[in-house]
Amino acid sequence: MAVPARTCGASWPGPVRTARPWPGRGPRPCPDPRGPASGPARPLLLLLPPLLLLPLLTAPGASAYSFPQQHTMQHWARRLEQEIDGVMRIFGGVQQLREIYKDNRNLFEVQENEPQKLVEKVAGDIESLLDRKVQALKRLADAAENFQKAHRWQDNIKEEDIMYYDAKADAELDDPESEDMERGSKTSALRLDFIEDPNFKNKVNYSYTAVQIPTDIYKGSTVILNELNWTEALENVFIENRRQDPTLLWQVFGSATGVTRYYPATPWRAPKKIDLYDVRRRPWYIQGASSPKDMVIIVDVSGSVSGLTLKLMKTSVCEMLDTLSDDDYVNVASFNEKAQPVSCFTHLVQANVRNKKVFKEAVQGMVAKGTTGYKAGFEYAFDQLQNSNITRANCNKMIMMFTDGGEDRVQDVFEKYNWPNRTVRVFTFSVGQHNYDVTPLQWMACTNKGYYFEIPSIGAIRINTQEYLDVLGRPMVLAGKDAKQVQWTNVYEDALGLGLVVTGTLPVFNLTQDGPGEKKNQLILGVMGIDVALNDIKRLTPNYTLGANGYVFAIDLNGYVLLHPNLKPQTTNFREPVTLDFLDAELEDENKEEIRRSMIDGDKGHKQIRTLVKSLDERYIDEVIRNYTWVPIRSTNYSLGLVLPPYSTYYLQANLSDQILQVKLPISKLKDFEFLLPSSFESEGHVFIAPREYCKDLNASDNNTEFLKNFIELMEKVTPDSKQCNNFLLHNLILDTGITQQLVERVWRDQDLNTYSLLAVFAATDGGITRVFPNKAAEDWTENPEPFNASFYRRSLDNHGYIFKPPHQDSLLRPLELENDTVGVLVSTAVELSLGRRTLRPAVVGVKLDLEAWAEKFKVLASNRTHQDQPQKCGPSSHCEMDCEVNNEDLLCVLIDDGGFLVLSNQNHQWDQVGRFFSEVDANLMLALYNNSFYTRKESYDYQAACAPQPPGNLGAAPRGVFVPTIADFLNLAWWTSAAAWSLFQQLLYGLIYHSWFQADPAEAEGSPETRESSCVMKQTQYYFGSVNASYNAIIDCGNCSRLFHAQRLTNTNLLFVVAEKPLCSQCEAGRLLQKETHSDGPEQCELVQRPRYRRGPHICFDYNATEDTSDCGRGASFPPSLGVLVSLQLLLLLGLPPRPQPQVHSFAASRHL
């Protein structure tokens, strides 16, 4: 990026300046005020109070001053470095804290983290956890198959014959419009009592199972009642499973009929709108019910497909896409005389969330025109499936065709591409109400091992876009025991409130024989699932021995993370899994791509890499060294990794002496414990303790004062070696309490902070202690009480020297308006401890600078004052250099941190901008610093962000969702007997039932969490120091408006010292660099699919079985017209029944949530 050059009208007195380093203009600067070297330099702060008493120099005129020479500014930089270093040496207490640790060497041991042993142990623990769930799954699946095989079908079964707990009963009883209220309460409905269980985050009943039946399925049908009858026997198996493994969470059987039976019983979490949950559309069910798919969807957009039929097709395609998972590949094309893709994707792409979003948006743009050309559509689809040069599922291959009907059977196309092996299944969908002969569509499906469906109206879409899974399940069922393999899902949001979970799935087969010929049944009964909460897996990983910047992560075969500290979705969608790629969870580079590939391949490995990491507050980038170690988790598709910085190879473990442990008194009686009591804060400083799980009975609280109170109360009852407490955490906390108290005693208490313009001094430790001195400074302490979650703590560990952290500009008040409050800048540094040959960083210490006072001191330190208090004399006959104090109207002097945020300025009007990105303060100068490589930037995407919902468009004149007849239609007798009339009535019927499919509930839009925020992508930009380390002079070239500037890194800090001429005119304004997070559509998906990330599909595939019976290949799904209903609706319309609000097809996907 080049610095933009512009010519301005203003003139500049003096010589023309060029864009090159210069020896300086005017006289040399004052002699080095440090004098001869006579010992270590003292902090200049000791000299500042008398300097501040001197009268300010009066500028004798612009002609008397020149821009400072380079070595003058280097001298100022050295003064700043010495001042910072001197203050930190006196108050930071780094050396003193080292001595304190060594003096207390008998109170702790140094333990080593051995990456290979650690990762193998954790992988083994996770394997054991999941294996227990696998055994429970197998018991359930075997029992279900046996129960169903022994069940005798009952044609005359009635609702009152079946007793079960309807999970939605409580919600339906509260809803006067519910199905049960309309038909009256049933004696078959059990009423249960529930108890709160924190493991389920819900009220549960351990004696019963609960049943959930989708709203669009009649629970009194013979099929459903028989299903309820035989699945009741699963209750005892669920209970026995829990007896054998009390850690089991939800055990679920999802039936192919749509019935869900789960244990333990709990009321269904039904939304305020209509409940459209269907287990068959859940990610875990889809994965368990069939093998991966390569699917091409072709949509007839000929001229006959228009209005309602086209809208039904668009909705159907979107629903079909929702039945696909990340193991599947898909493309969508429209056809008339020619076929073309609806989106920018020219080949099969992975059916992930972002790709499906592209398809769904593109489908809405389809327009009907031309004539029907089945041949073009099918040839395009077969060519897509035969393309072997792309990544794909390489398992089930299928074509899904949506049309309103036609006569052509395109037999020649099938003969060319698919016969005789018939490796591609063809599913045909007749959409809308029409009078076309459907025989050709049925023939296409039946001769290509597929199925024919009818979608006459909106109510038939959901069921008919998911039942193809039954056909795909046939080879799996016929494979028998070979297909009985447990699969583990991606991470997704549990529908019953557990949070993020993974689910182990196992298909359940129908073992009955069909008819007297003893032909084997080939239908899948359903899928058995057992949930495992991510929190339960996290508990198996080491939390605090890895240090603040060490962590464990796990990924699956798609490269999606199962565990990762950055897996923190702010919103979740029940319909989609949570898919965060490892390369999106971290900042991507080539080394991480290699690690990811090796993990997906199931290899072991270790690699030390230099990489970039984003700070916890997402404002900074650090270049760090990390050690990655990884192993596969056996019997699963997961791989586990461990990340350690070199300084976390060792950690401290408190070793409270036998004498202390032998005193069987509460912990509160220990000597060091008294320094946790609030009564000691006034003299010893305020103590924040990390809200960790020290003991099982400790009540958590977001308020640290409340948490400390709970902790102290519990410690009154607990001995140091109590079995209910985590001794490692508890002992380390007490150890660090005593060590930080000694820092107060040896260093802080005897120092006068006000003399050095300090608001506070502090220390934070790995053991979870943050001590802030003096006590009153705690009132303005805003850092996280958990050091591992505090940005200053983690950044200090990763960097050498002093790390400045200005306050975030959103929380900053104008200093001149401050009354009793003051604004501070944190300066922190890690304490590196060497014990023998072992080095570690167990703590971070620092100070909090008074911003207003230090802004004044900054000006003096960057001035031409001498130690002899002799200001430089300038007059008409002599020249001297400008400085940051006297010439602040002409000279801009700033300290900027490594993220580009303003820390200090010599401009009083900029004090309220401290903490802002410098481009917002001086865009021209920041761009020059970037162009001259003082800064570089990193752009990335946050795929887990939450955004406010977009205001709905065209509310006043939304397009109609259904055909509305005109007066002429009502007067035309032929119209009343046409298919169009019946289609309208069917739409109205379904509109009465499924109104929420088309139109969002106004009440929900006002207050529901689902409508307040939605998942979105945010683009993030962070800046960090570039390759320039030396002192550097440059010019911002803008003709007569050009500006000179000097920039230099301050040694042992994260600061850049910049001195520049203030801009003379505004015409030189350049483009502004942006740092603020912005809403984005993410990277261009059309480009990303051309270079897909490496992945592997499941190891098993069941797409063919020679014994498969394909004769069952199609049926209509519309219900026959009822003369009574038809006549009634006609009368109501003729009598002027007020119309319901028109349903909006375009909001169908947005207004319902599974």
Curated annotation (Swiss-Prot):
Changing residue 282 to A: Induces a strong decrease in gabapentin-binding. N-glycosylated. May be proteolytically processed into subunits alpha-2-2 and delta-2 that are disulfide-linked. It is however unclear whether such cleavage really takes place in vivo and has a functional role. According to PubMed:11306709, it is processed, at least in vitro, while according to PubMed:17052222, it is only poorly processed in vivo. The MIDAS-like motif in the VWFA domain binds divalent metal cations and is required to promote trafficking of the alpha-1 (CACNA1) subunit to the plasma membrane by an integrin-like switch. Residues 1138-1154 are cytoplasmic. The lineage of its organism: Eukaryota, Metazoa, Chordata, Craniata, Vertebrata. It comes from the Eukaryota. It is linked to Defects in Cacna2d2 are the cause of ducky phenotype (du). Du mice have spike-wave seizures characteristic of absence epilepsy and ataxia, with accompanying decreased calcium channel current in cerebellar Purkinje cells. The chain crosses the membrane at residues 1117-1137. Glycans are attached at residues 205, 389, 421, 510, 543, 627, 864. Residues 294-472 form the VWFA domain. A motif (MIDAS-like motif) lies at residues 300-304. It comes from Mus musculus (Mouse). One of its GO terms (cellular component) is plasma membrane. It holds the Pfam family VWA. InterPro entries: Ca_channel_alpha-2/delta, VDCC_a2/dsu, VWA_N, VWF_A, vWFA_dom_sf. Disruption phenotype: Mice exhibit growth retardation, reduced life span, ataxic gait with apoptosis of cerebellar granule cells followed by Purkinje cell depletion, enhanced susceptibility to seizures, and cardiac abnormalities. This is Voltage-dependent calcium channel subunit alpha-2/delta-2. It is a single-pass type I membrane protein. One of its GO terms (molecular function) is metal ion binding. Keywords: Calcium, Calcium channel, Calcium transport, Disease variant, Disulfide bond, Glycoprotein, Ion channel, Ion transport, Membrane, Metal-binding, Signal, Transmembrane, Transmembrane helix, Transport, Voltage-gated channel. Gene3D superfamilies: PAS domain (3.30.450.20), von Willebrand factor, type A domain (3.40.50.410). GO terms for biological process: calcium ion transport; muscle cell development; neuromuscular junction development; organ growth; positive regulation of organ growth; regulation of multicellular organism growth; regulation of neurotransmitter receptor localization to postsynaptic specialization membrane; rhythmic synaptic transmission.
